[in-house]
C-alpha cells in the first residue's frame, strides 16, 4: 500500500498536469479570448498574428501534461518515478527560463509548483 507521502506526490503531479492542460487550452484554442485576459501585459493587436506561435507553445504544454499523466499509470515504481522526474524537471527548467526571459510570474506559477512536486517525488520510494 502506498504511503501518504506518495499519494500527496501523485496528487501534486496530477495538479501540475491539469495546469498544463489548462495552458494548452488557452494557447491552442482560446488565444484571442482567454489569452488576452491571461497575458494582459501584451497589447491586444498582437494576439491574432501570434495565434500559430501560441498554439505551438500550447502543444508543448500538452506534451508535458501527457508525460506527467503517463507517469501516474506506469506500473514499475522506479520507471514511474523516473518519468515524473524528467517531466517535472522540464517544467522547472522552463519556469526558470521563462522567469529570466519573460516574466518572474512564470516561475512562481509553473516552475515553483513543479519544483515542490519534484522534491516530493524525489523523497518517495
Name each region found by the language model:
Residues 113-125:
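Small-residue-rich segments of transmembrane alpha-helices in multi-pass membrane proteins
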Residues 28-50:
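Cytosolic, membrane-interface loops and tails of multi-pass inner-membrane proteins
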Residues 58-98:
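Mid-chain, well-packed structural core segment of small domains
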Residues 86-116:
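C-terminal structural segments of small proteins and small subunits
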Residues 2-12, 47-50, 77-84, 103-106:
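Membrane-interface helix-boundary signature
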Residues 8-29:
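N-terminal signal-anchor transmembrane alpha helix
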Residues 46-63:
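Interfacial helix-start motif at the membrane-water boundary
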Amino acid at each position: 500500500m502506498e504511503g501518504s507521502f506518495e499519494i500527496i506526490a501523485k496528487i501534486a503531479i496530477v495538479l501540475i498536469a491539469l495546469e498544463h492542460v489548462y495552458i494548452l487550452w488557452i494557447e491552442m484554442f482560446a488565444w484571442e479570448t482567454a489569452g488576452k485576459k491571461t497575458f494582459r501585459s501584451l497589447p491586444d493587436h498582437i494576439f491574432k498574428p501570434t495565434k500559430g506561435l501560441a498554439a505551438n507553445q500550447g502543444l508543448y504544454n500538452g506534451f508535458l501534461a501527457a508525460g506527467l499523466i503517463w507517469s501516474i499509470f506506469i506500473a514499475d515504481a522506479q520507471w514511474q518515478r523516473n518519468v515524473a522526474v524528467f517531466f517535472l524537471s522540464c517544467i522547472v527548467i522552463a519556469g526558470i527560463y521563462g522567469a529570466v526571459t519573460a516574466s518572474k510570474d512564470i516561475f512562481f506559477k509553473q516552475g515553483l509548483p513543479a519544483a515542490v512536486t519534484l522534491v516530493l517525488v524525489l523523497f518517495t520510494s
